């Protein structure tokens, strides 16, 4: 009555295997991976030809039909899954279990099948069990059972007898119940066995005991057939019949949850499936991580004090720990496979309890993880906090009993792949900048000007004769100070560049990220060479005898290398700054809220020092760069400090509330310091002398006067940027300073062209025009300042 047995099952449902991965393009489309088993709900979807409505892991959606393959029945006499059959049967008593007999026998009276609607309907009572059907990465399926009210639980992987003689077919275990798996499985009383295995494995058949009864047509399976399918003998428990992973009443929990290994004292040792078994045959792609281990004997003397998941039928990977006496759970083999992010497969999204081999080992790992977290939390900087890695290969498999902790582990598992790939960047990219757009632009421009001016200060000493003894002996100290300024300015700019790179890592524009990273790497390499050469010179205390060279060197020394790299830095810095300014809206957020009031702190003296500090630093730099005027500037700076402190602190020590920009008078101009006034006057004098040298048309004099104009102009720009504090005024000064720098560069290029093409009237005329443009802009710039 095979046909009748099939018809007795639930209504027919189609299953399909996914042939390819599918990434959904909309919310109605179903996502699945290759090898997933989908339940086809509807093949003719209105207005969606070529799409099927399918169900996977409790999610419904449309799936492309050309990516699915409908699964057909392999054998007509496949047993009907018992837990599907239970949906149609009457309620059962608390003393029944399921059994698959081996020989057709007339049925004996016994309890009916227990009702199994609890796993498919509504909320469960406190004593019910919730079933979840995971889709592990391997081809084997397991039924994970989560107990809500009592701790005993079991995860069983059951071999299919009718598949034992088909070793070439893919291995299967019970998954979502379907109706076409075979004939009806009848109930059996307690104290019965599924398989009656003789004591000697040489017997040709399987003979069940007299007490066993069955009413279904299961074909007789010989031992040779089982061996061909990977079985030598099967367990012969002396307790109740074969235990299926199905719901039972609380009173039966102690019987059905008893692990198979607990019968070891009453039964003979049995063999586990070999590597050629059709019961568990992982794909070749993952076979490297699974090494079949045939544990032929089960320990006889083991007494379990805690519930244990039976180990029968699982091929554990290499290095799996043995069970101890204080076992709480045994992790299934599907969860001992290497982590999901290492296999490029979908993570297990089900809320499966995870555990380690023993309570003691779990306690040790928890203690280690706690120490690591405390150590990592002790660091003050959150930008460069590194991801801590646990010394155990299974650190994230520890989970608490609460559903919240397990949910957090599941959610973190689903995003581990992307997290690992995005966090593999260097430590430099971990730092981020949280700056306003305007502040970021001002910062990068100020740092750029600082690098350019420091490099220009060193280039003033570089000429054809700068390594001669007389010249180098007079300027060795100034050159040393210039190298210090260059190293400091480049270091500050590189720190800012790393912060910009860290901010760019949060963007989706990979092209912008690559541009910023490449340009930052160029600056970083230059800075590394500067450090190496400067440290080499500092370690030798800048020996004059070694640095003096009266002839051309065949290979550059440390000082020459420093100058060569520093000469190229302004262009690299400018390129990086242009990238940041052009993409500022992507990298930084615009601060739309402008502060209307600015209040001084109660410590007015601190504010006074803050406003006076930049001129003091600039004064010190000028004292170092111009030793001849050291005494005069020292006296001037001390007077300036006293005057400015008296003016600022004496005005109003209380809150300072500036008028809104709309109410301010247009005549208000930035107030210049005495240093800036002096530099403006010096620049006008240098430009006048430059015009005089152009009239005489002497190349040497033209070069000298041009260098003087450029040097004074750079010092003026540097002083203006350092002394300006107010944001609105600072932006205005930075714009004028940037234009002034571009004009100085044009003058330098025109001077070079005029000298190389001397005595070309056209080149001299072009140089004259550039000098006039510089003078005109300088006068306009000076007029905008107070």
Curated annotation (Swiss-Prot):
Tissue specificity note: Expressed abundantly in lung and spleen. Also highly expressed in ovarian and leukemia cell lines.
Any single biological process term in GO: cell adhesion
Tagged with keyword Phosphoprotein: yes
Chain residue ranges for the region called Disordered: 262-295, 361-429, 612-670
Example GO molecular function: protein tyrosine kinase binding
Residue numbers carrying Phosphoserine: 200, 249, 305, 376, 390
InterPro entries with a match to the protein in the record: CAS_C, CAS_fam, CASS4_SH3, Serine_rich_dom, Serine_rich_sf, SH3-like_dom_sf, SH3_domain
Comp. bias (Polar residues): 273-295, 374-391
Keyword presence, Phosphoprotein: yes
Name assigned to this protein: Cas scaffolding protein family member 4
Species this protein is from: Homo sapiens
